[in-house]
Amino acid sequence: MRLQDLSPGLGELDERHRLRRRATLESPQGDEVVIDGRSYISFASNDYLGLADHPSLVRALQQGADRWGAGSGASHLLTGHTLAHQQAEEALAGFVGREAALLFGSGYAANLAVITSLVGRGDAVFADKLNHASLNDGCLLSRADFQRFRHNDLAHLEQLLADSGAPTKLIAVDAVYSMDGDQAPLPALLALAERYDAWLYVDDAHGFGVLGDGRGSAALHGLASDRLIYMATLGKAAGLAGAFVAGCRPLVDWLVNKARTYIYTTAQPPALAAAVGASLRLIAEGGERRERLRQLISRCRQRLEGTPYAGASATAIQPFVVGSDENAVRLAETLREQGYWVPAVRPPTVPENGARLRISLSARHELSQLDALLDLMLRPAES
């Protein structure tokens, strides 16, 4: 893309209803937010347990800054790895029942790290068609043979695995799919990984803190295997920022030595790491929050049942697929006029003709807020 092509390119995106603009939040995250000077009820964040503004987390972060300062100042392999980082990794590993864990600045960085460190030229990686962009980018950057199987189609995956002669194989999936909210069949995927001597890499960005009593999708299914690599983010249900990878000790040691997005970057602020313990305690004690979330999910599914918008999601992500980009943008604008913030999601984030509004539920929402939103969203279909 040349300099002279930028403005016309942006104009083309605008004409196709695909120009992205940032909204400026002027309040803490929550069910009610202030954006560009106006108050809205938000169904747009991934703050599933409502912890992003929890007093205990805010206090832990402040205390961490008082103890460790504002920045880490170096990469983990120089002088950026503090006791706060070490204790956070130990706590995270114990929480999800693995030998070791490694902190990353983001889930994107973690996904690139794991995939590019374990497979390369001559190897093969097998990815679900609906995987997050960061998983796809990791697969592409690895230079391994990148094969995509139909969404949650175990027979198709097994065929690809059986036909592959690659010495190292890696299966990469989202545990909860970010745009549809449905879940990967993890037990069956692990069985295939065992059968074909493959790694199973699970991105549980949207399951950690919510599923399996908060310990995530692998815990929900009682899965334990050294070939299962578990990644979760700390910026969604956990209320903080960053991510971690958990697995057997040799795996984590390998990543410390080979993962470029771990080695060649400054460590995340130690104050964030210092707050991880408080986050895990809130998650462990968050049974009532998860029950409230289940009630909201049930209500949403009940309201959408029998409409063209009913889906397969039993998680906090409830997609409302409208098809065209223009219709999605128009509906989002209508909701904003009524005081609801539910942004339109358009290609390439979702497939062509799959534009949607993604209803993201939080334990902080009231049933009345959800009902009022759905009344507005379903009105065109009911009229």
UniProtKB/Swiss-Prot annotation:
It catalyses: 6-carboxyhexanoyl-[ACP] + L-alanine + H(+) = (8S)-8-amino-7-oxononanoate + holo-[ACP] + CO2. One of its GO terms (molecular function) is 8-amino-7-oxononanoate synthase activity. It is an enzyme of class 2 (transferase). InterPro entries: Aminotransferase_I/II_large, AON_synthase_class-II, AONS_Archaea/Proteobacteria, AONS_Proteobacteria, PyrdxlP-dep_Trfase, PyrdxlP-dep_Trfase_major, PyrdxlP-dep_Trfase_small. Its cofactor is pyridoxal 5'-phosphate. Keywords: Biotin biosynthesis, Pyridoxal phosphate, Transferase. Pfam families: Aminotran_1_2 (PF00155). The modification N6-(pyridoxal phosphate)lysine is found at K236. Substrate binds at R20, H132, T349. GO terms for biological process: biotin biosynthetic process. Disulfide bonds: none annotated. Signal peptide: none annotated. Pathway: Cofactor biosynthesis; biotin biosynthesis. It comes from the Bacteria. Its EC number is 2.3.1.47. Pyridoxal 5'-phosphate binds at G107, Y108, S178, H206, T233. HAMAP family: BioF_aminotrans_2 (MF_01693). Belongs to the class-II pyridoxal-phosphate-dependent aminotransferase family. BioF subfamily. Homodimer. Catalyzes the decarboxylative condensation of pimeloyl-[acyl-carrier protein] and L-alanine to produce 8-amino-7-oxononanoate (AON), [acyl-carrier protein], and carbon dioxide. This is 8-amino-7-oxononanoate synthase. It comes from Chromobacterium violaceum (strain ATCC 12472 / DSM 30191 / JCM 1249 / CCUG 213 / NBRC 12614 / NCIMB 9131 / NCTC 9757 / MK). The lineage of its organism: Bacteria, Pseudomonadati, Pseudomonadota, Betaproteobacteria, Neisseriales.
